[in-house]
Every structure is written in structure tokens, then in C-alpha cells.
A protein has these predicted regions:
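Terminal amphipathic alpha-helical/low-complexity segments used for targeting or macromolecular assembly
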Residues: 1-77
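Structural signal for interior beta-strand "rungs" in well-ordered beta-sheet cores
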Residues: 72, 76-97
Length: 97
């Protein structure tokens, strides 16, 4: 699977919205969608190491999969303790991290 950064960003948006999922429950069993797993790995290959320091939390990671930012409108609770959510992760409303 070959994609560019724009295609990968669109792919992440589909993951974040829940339109596509890495795994699905089919007939009571969980099935991994291997093509999605491969696309996520491709995103790491596409990325460039970037300084993503946030306040007092310094870190360096690939620019294709940054930490997600949430607002009150997302209805997701992010509590203190070192949790982070990367780009491409789906969090339903009312989730507590």
C-alpha cells in the first residue's frame, strides 16, 4: 500500500470518525482489517521526526501521527496522569481517558 501524507491524513480522519475500524466484531468474533493495520504502519514510514513538545512535556515523534487535541464539544474526558491519544484514534462521546 503506497500513500502520500494527504491520503494518510484522510485515512486518519476516517479512523477518528469511526467510518473505518482496525477490528470489527463479525458473527461474535473479532476480525482484524489487515489493510488498515498496514496503512497505519505506512503512516509511520511517511512521517518525519518532529519536536512536538507541549508545555513541560517534551517529546519527539513522527509528524504523521501527532497527539490529538480535544475540546469540550467532543464530550471526551481526558483526566491527568500521562494519557495521550494519537491522530487516527476513535474515541466515542462519554469516553474517559
Amino acid at each position: 500500500m503506497i500513500m502520500d501524507k494527504k491520503q494518510f491524513a484522510d485515512f486518519c480522519a476516517d479512523l477518528e470518525s469511526g467510518r473505518i475500524r482496525v477490528a470489527e466484531k463479525i458473527d461474535g468474533n473479532w476480525k482484524v482489517n489487515a489493510w488498515i493495520k498496514e496503512a497505519i504502519l505506512e503512516g509511520f514510514k511517511l512521517g518525519t521526526l518532529t519536536d512536538m513538545t507541549e508545555g513541560q512535556f517534551p517529546f519527539i515523534d513522527k509528524d504523521t501521527i501527532p497527539v490529538r487535541k480535544f475540546t469540550v464539544e467532543d464530550k471526551v474526558r481526558i483526566v491527568p496522569g500521562g494519557s495521550s491519544v494519537r491522530r487516527g484514534a476513535y474515541l466515542a462521546p462519554s469516553v474517559i481517558m
